[in-house]
């Protein structure tokens, strides 16, 4: 990885390549912060005191270079098994205020752990971040954790008991077949999570 500083144009090119939408300076700053939050185990942490700033120094420049190279090589860009593209809102840019990508740190770490424990063959998120417009369009709750970037809809192939015993999540949504299809980190307890059941169609 290069230790030199990237130019603003290079930063924008790399962020766009890995999935971020950047039309303004404000969106670029948002994207840099989201990149730092999501960046996990592909290099040194980019957080300072657990927080992300919009400054791009040598370490962040090197991380952006690596993420860009991994994207070009068809590898994950955010963590060992997940890419920023997998977290982005599925509105496709239909809503002008959509930030596109804003996963929480905990969501990334927990999904890596869940994959290792229950999905060793691979786990593809069904839905992660949602902007207000898209969340409303798909019938999501007004207080949906997808709006905050800490909820992920997953393939419902594992039972409530299996997912619950991992003690990773405080919110679990269960399909009529008894398998979990939604996990989140709302305020609460991972040992006694909030559980709800979706009705059949």
Regions found by a protein language model. Give the residues of each.
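Surface-exposed patches in mature extracellular/periplasmic domains of secreted proteins
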Residues: 23-24, 52, 120-129, 171-176
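Catalytic cores and adjacent binding grooves of peptidoglycan-active enzymes
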Residues: 141-201
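Cell-envelope/ECM-targeting effectors and their regulatory/trafficking segments
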Residues: 1-116, 141
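Extended, low-complexity, intrinsically disordered C-terminal regulatory tails
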Residues: 111-139
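A mature extracytoplasmic/lumenal domain signature
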Residues: 56, 60, 68, 127-129, ...
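Generic non-transmembrane alpha-helical segments
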Residues: 18, 113-121, 162-168
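Short, solvent-exposed polar/charged micro-motifs at secondary-structure junctions
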Residues: 65, 133-139, 182-186
């Amino acid at each position: 990885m290069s230790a030199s500083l990237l130019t603003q144009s290079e930063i924008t090119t790399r962020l766009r390549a890995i999935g971020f939408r950047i039309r303004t300076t404000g969106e670029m700053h948002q994207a840099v912060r989201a990149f730092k939050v999501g960046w996990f185990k592909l290099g040194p942490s980019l957080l300072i005191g657990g927080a992300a700033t919009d400054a791009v120094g040598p370490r962040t420049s090197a991380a952006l270079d690596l993420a860009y190279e991994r994207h070009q090589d068809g590898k994950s860009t955010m963590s060992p098994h997940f890419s920023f593209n997998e977290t982005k809102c599925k509105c496709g840019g239909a809503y002008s205020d959509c930030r596109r990508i804003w996963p929480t740190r905990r969501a990334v770490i927990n999904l890596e752990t869940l994959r290792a424990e229950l999905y060793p063959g691979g786990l593809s998120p069904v839905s992660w971040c949602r902007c207000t417009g898209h969340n409303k369009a798909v019938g999501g709750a007004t207080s949906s954790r997808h709006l905050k970037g800490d909820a992920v809809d997953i393939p419902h192939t594992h039972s409530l008991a299996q997912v619950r015993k991992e003690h990773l999540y405080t919110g679990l949504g269960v399909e009529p077949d008894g398998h979990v299809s939604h996990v989140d980190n709302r305020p609460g307890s991972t040992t006694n999570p909030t559980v709800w059941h979706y009705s059949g169609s």
